[in-house]
Amino acid sequence: MNKKLLVTCFEPFNQKKVNSSFVAVEKLADKIGDYNLTKLTVPVVYGKAFETVHLKIEELKPDVILCVGQAGGRKNVTLEKIAINYRSATICDNEGNKYDGIKIDENGDDGIFVNLEVEKLAEISGCEVSLSAGSFVCNDLIYMIRNYYQDKVQAGFIHVPYLPEQTKGDSASLSLEEIVLKLTLIIENL
């Protein structure tokens, strides 16, 4: 039976021309395992990222949502275990918003675990588990999805490293082929 998978990625941000999450998600096949993929690029803007994804969720009614974002400095693809109710970053989003330690939802839980088996998926795919999606727009998106939808839909977040062409010297990066392979393995084993 074919299932619906919504896979999101982000536009470039912080005055960069490339976002590795966008490049990798665009390279994914349209059908992987039991899943028909719908790909969606979202803005790197607090709140608007969720608004964009929320509209697509309501239209598509996916079985699973996988959000993919870029995390410079990481050497491997990482599955995020928890989203935190916190906005704080040293850089602005793509509309110039910058927060220094505020809650996403004043009445929300401090943290919400994703409802995917991240340890199992990491082991199968050769990825790592991370306990922090940060406090920028990536975390904002997965927190808002989990807070709004609770367990009505499975949702998780995956951070991918920079691509080699985004780095200088021996900075952490991973090839596009390796990132796409790991994302594919994760999807095949959802």
Predicted regions and their residues:
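Active-site glycine-rich loop that binds ribose-phosphate moieties when present
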Residues: V137-N139
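N-terminal catalytic or cofactor-binding beta/alpha core of small enzyme domains
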Residues: M1-S135, R146-D151, S171-E177, I187-L190
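C-terminal folded domains that constitute the principal catalytic or ligand-binding module
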Residues: E123, I145, V153-Q166, T184-E188
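Mixed-charge interfacial surface used for oligomerization/domain docking
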Residues: T167, I179-V180
